[in-house]
Amino acid sequence: LNLAEADIDPAWQEIDYGDLDGMPIEQWRAVAAPQFAAFRHDLAALAPPNGETWLAFRDRVLAAWQALLDYPDDSHLLLVTHGGVLRVILPTVLGMPLNASFPLHIPFASFSRLQLRTSKEGLRATLLFHNAAAYALPAAENPDQ
């Protein structure tokens, strides 16, 4: 991996949670719970104070996704990003509504592999595997087993 050739593209950053960033998780859950409950039915419901709305986040990530059309077929890209970004990309690939992504388990340091092909119709993607890191750990180290 030659990081000298790495591009850092802010379009792939996690959603800006505004005032919720840095808040202890227990407090964050209490404050954000009503928004996340409403979000399951209305994408516009997630709008952290002084942060990025889910709709703006979705549009930013999907624009970056479409920019992958600029790469030639058979390119190999490594995208290092956050769970929120995957909650936009994976449902897009799988044809799921974006607010139905919460059943997808996306733990820290997991990785997914997508195969992308471009055509006149646009970008076609296939999910080859998801959440491989959870299965790479021995059972004693993996709290999900």
Regions found by a protein language model. Give the residues of each.
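Phosphate-handling substructures
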Residues: L1-L62, E141, Q145
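Acidic, low-complexity terminal tails and accessory targeting/binding regions
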Residues: L3, I15-Q27, D70-S75, P91-Q145
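Ser/Thr-centric signal marking residues that sit
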Residues: T53, T81, S112
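Non-transmembrane alpha-helical segments in soluble domains
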Residues: R58, L62-W65, L69, L90
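Generic beta-sheet signal
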Residues: A67-L68, S75-T81
